[in-house]
């Protein structure tokens, strides 16, 4: 219940700050933000992936010291000082992590990945539009 209350508060705050912005782009952004708030709530409530995660398929994380990960929340899969990115990206460690992500073995509300995950998931579009209309 506390998560639900907080989610509603976040949505109201976003709406307040964006209410003077009336371009179509602004309305789409507001719809996406509303959808993402609902997505975070559902993810935390169900403790599982709600939409597919693209980490490891179109994303990579490179840390200043050269470590590479598929996501900031997953273990490092290699280091650019030791191997090139192609070798790291195609490594068995990377493939294992991709399989686990695809199977839904990890779930999160990662603010950097979730917007792209939602945009690349067409079944989410009706809910994004509903959030646009509500606002």
Give the ranges of each region predicted by the language model.
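Radical SAM enzyme [4Fe-4S]-AdoMet core and its adjacent flexible, acidic
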Residues: 1-55, 61-64, 68-69, 75, ...
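Flexible mid-to-C-terminal extensions adjoining Fe-S/redox cofactors in radical SAM and related proteins
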Residues: 48-50, 67-135
